[in-house]
Amino acid sequence: MAVSPKINRREHILQCLAQMLETSPGQRITTAKLASEVGVSEAALYRHFPSKARMFEGLIEFIEESLLSRINIIMDDEKDTMRRCQLVLQLLLIFAERNPGISRVLNGDALLGENERLRSRISTLFAKIETQLKQILREKTLREGKGFNLDEAILANLLLAFAEGRIAQFVRSEFKLKPTQHFDEQWRFIQHQLLQS
């Protein structure tokens, strides 16, 4: 497969890795298979990435930049607490749905047997998202004069667990059960429950 001059080799390797994660669910990706997919030798892969762990870190950096920058935009543009929560959850689910191979990284499925620091980085990413949700929920008291009856940390954890569960179903179903399926109805129910708490 020829690489257009506009796409650098490093990006192409990461795109091929994400594609292989999507088309080979449940299978471990070896550098030999990846090199074959990219159309280069394993040595050529290692000229761009010193290890397979660094390749996965490249994908994780893409995930972090994509999600956290968009969450910051949501925080700047939207002031309503419930709408912010909805948009953050929707962002996670749409991102996973549009990037099935990368959803395996988010879920941790693709990281089994890989370097522990990769799973740690994904855990840290989800902790940052949970902290954002907690902040959104805590600001409700400041913005609207009324908070929740339940601790915001517990509510933030519940919201994140919902999104992680939908992503896990997507991966487990080999990308057949879309994370956004029924989201609007589910969100209405969740929002109603949150406003009652």
Curated annotation (Swiss-Prot):
One matching Pfam family, short form?
A: SlmA-like_C
GO BP: cell division; negative regulation of division septum assembly
**GO terms, molecular function:** sequence-specific DNA binding
Where does the record place the HTH tetR-type domain? 7-67
Entry-linked InterPro entries: Homeodomain-like_sf (IPR009057), HTH-type_Tx_Regulator (IPR050624), HTH_TetR (IPR001647), NO_SlmA (IPR023769), SlmA-like_C (IPR054580)
Q: Which UniProt keywords are listed?
A: Cell cycle, Cell division, Cytoplasm, DNA-binding
One Gene Ontology CC term in the entry: cytoplasm
The record's DNA-binding region positions are 30-49
Locations listed in the record: Cytoplasm, Nucleoid
Tell me its family: Belongs to the nucleoid occlusion factor SlmA family.
Subunit description = Homodimer. Interacts with FtsZ.
Q: What does this protein do?
A: Required for nucleoid occlusion (NO) phenomenon, which prevents Z-ring formation and cell division over the nucleoid. Acts as a DNA-associated cell division inhibitor that binds simultaneously chromosomal DNA and FtsZ, and disrupts the assembly of FtsZ polymers. SlmA-DNA-binding sequences (SBS) are dispersed on non-Ter regions of the chromosome, preventing FtsZ polymerization at these regions.
Question: What is the name attached to this protein's record?
Answer: Nucleoid occlusion factor SlmA
